[in-house]
């Protein structure tokens, strides 16, 4: 077994991470078969520069390491966003020092079509309904109003601005910070409950 194969041996989390279905999307655990799509989309500087941890350039090896790492982490939920059986992005709830953090990105060809909002709503429903978190946090670069709109449409409330390191630009940048509490989420659930696919 090669080193690459060893890294992926325990990588399937289909038995741990549920499959979530929305009107147009399916969210499921990352798989080795997603490596090329993830590498292709994440290698776009517009994506990397708007996330904290994606390097630029981003290659196949980066995608392999990402999938191996997220599938080994306990207590986190990472999903590949699927449209018509093809990966179009990633969303996750990561356990951070200041609370569970929602993160997401979509391949550029899928921007502006409501997919991010749809995926994040499903992720939020899972985080509050299944993982039983009390609060979620998230952030968007101040230069990324589209991501800010996604968070606001999902009920997140702005809490301030702070500097955060952006790996792709090798520097810190101002980030709008957001928070969503369980009570507000419960009052906004008119967007409909996500279906859990077993």
Regions found by a protein language model. Give the residues of each.
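Short loop/turn motifs at secondary-structure junctions and domain boundaries
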Residues: 69-75
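Acyl-donor (CoA/ACP) binding surface of acyl/acetyltransferases
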Residues: 1-49, 78-198
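Conserved GNAT-fold acetyl-CoA-binding loop/helix
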Residues: 46-68
């Amino acid at each position: 077994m090669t080193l690459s194969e060893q890294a992926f041996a325990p990588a399937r989390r289909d038995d741990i991470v549920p499959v979530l279905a929305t009107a147009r999307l399916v969210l499921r655990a990352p798989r080795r078969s997603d490596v090329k799509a993830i590498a292709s989309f994440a290698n776009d500087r517009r994506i990397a520069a708007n996330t904290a941890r994606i390097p630029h350039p981003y290659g196949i090896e980066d995608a392999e390491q990402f999938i191996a790492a997220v599938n080994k982490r306990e207590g986190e939920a990472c999903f590949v966003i699927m449209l018509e059986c093809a990966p179009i992005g990633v969303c996750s709830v990561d356990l951070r020092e200041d609370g569970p953090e929602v993160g997401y990105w979509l391949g550029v060809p899928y921007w502006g079509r409501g997919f991010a909002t749809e995926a994040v709503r499903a992720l939020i429903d899972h985080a509050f309904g299944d993982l039983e978190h009390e609060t979620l946090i998230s952030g968007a670069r101040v230069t990324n109003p589209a991501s800010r709109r996604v968070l606001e449409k999902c009920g997140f409330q702005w809490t301030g601005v702070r500097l955060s390191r952006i790996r792709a630009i090798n520097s810190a940048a101002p980030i709008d910070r957001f928070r969503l509490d369980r009570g507000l989420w419960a009052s906004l659930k008119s967007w409909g409950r996500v279906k859990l696919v077993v």
